[in-house]
Structures are given as structure tokens and as C-alpha cells.
Amino acid sequence: MRKIVIHSPRAEVRALIRGLLSDIEAYFVPAATRSELVRICSTTKCDLVITDDVRMFLNGSDTVAQIRKGEPLPQIFVLSHDLSEEAVTALLELGVNQFISLPMAPERLRAKVASHYRELV
């Protein structure tokens, strides 16, 4: 079964993302901290990571490599209000697969996730 890790320091954001994706057939794993996210990704097979924490990628800790230690290599979607060219470019250069600007239409996130899974087939 597909596994999606939803990471956010805020429980209400994790719940909101989970609710928006309720029609996607997948096992959802919540992660509240960066260390929890890295642990989950290194100990279980996950297809997709969705996070709203831009800082963890930009702090020099090589979070993308830590998330992608195992197989399969999960796609990483980042949700953020920061639309600066520097932030978006840095995230993409670090290996983030999708940058989704907030606020967003719920359909947009569902479409991005559905598209990701169609590509896997």
C-alpha cells in the first residue's frame, strides 16, 4: 500500500492535509518533528513526504539526503507561503520535487498527489 508521511510541527496542519487527501488510497503517517520524519523515512518504505517546514531544508542539515536513505526514494512536496525566488530555487536545487504555494486550492494538492501516483504505475 502507498505510504504518505505528513510532516508539520502543527497538529492542525497535519490533520488538514490528511483530510484533504482522504480520497487517496494510502496509509498516512504523521510526523511532528524533523527527527521523527527522518526516523520514519529511514525505517519504513514511504512513497511521498508532504511538509510545510521549509526551514529544515535550508538550515544546512542535508535533510533531503536523510529522508532518502532508504528505498524507494520518496518524493518530497513542500507547502509554503514563502514565494521568494531564492527560497523556491534553493528547495528545488536541494532535491525537493514539488513546491506548492500557500494558500492553495485543496484540489491542487490532491491533483499533485494523484499525478505522482499515476507516474509510479
Language-model regions: role of each:
Residues R10-V29:
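Two-component/phosphorelay signaling modules centered on CheY-like receiver
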Residues A32-L48:
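Acidic, metal-coordinating helix/loop segments flanking the phosphotransfer/catalytic sites
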Residues S42-T44, Q66-L73, L94:
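Conserved phosphotransfer cores of two-component systems
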Residues D47-I67:
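Conserved phosphotransfer microenvironments
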Residues D62, D82-Q98:
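Alpha4 helix (beta4-alpha4-beta5 surface) of REC/receiver domains from two-component response regulators
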Residues L73-L83:
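A short, hydrophobic beta-strand element within the central beta-sheet of small alpha/beta folds
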Residues M104-V113:
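C-terminal output helix
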Residues A114-V121:
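The C-terminal output helix
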